[in-house]
């Protein structure tokens, strides 16, 4: 079991554009749609394929912007919003958001939430979906074990940063998957600033 920040990023380090859109990701050939498990059992899929990651997830945590993006961009033709994942999910927010089946809202301290995520994961991984600042809050408390990045062959020029923290990582694995470069890192700890 590990707590893993797994996300896709542009070549220039953005996880969403300034409009909170991920259209750039889902229009890239091979981009995994939320809730997809298409390649999880595909023996020919790269080891670091998104769908293989999804298969090991036991619980999910994300921020309010993430669930609002999913609600806005994945709700089709006036259909009711359905959270695309079956795993127990928490949304860290201080806003009043509409209830969503299968999603619990949390406005407390990440240190208090983490044990609940681990228990719900039942020996599987905790997926920190994002955004980057939420992943940073887990890292600040020493609760983030790994960073799993799928770097997409696109340059956005602006947007939401991948992980707005100074962290030292150790690369475990590197793989390619179509138009993506997949990288798995262990979190070593904070990267100190030069005192000079």
Predicted feature locations:
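Enzymes that bind and transform nitrogen-containing heteroaromatic metabolites
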Residues: 1-196
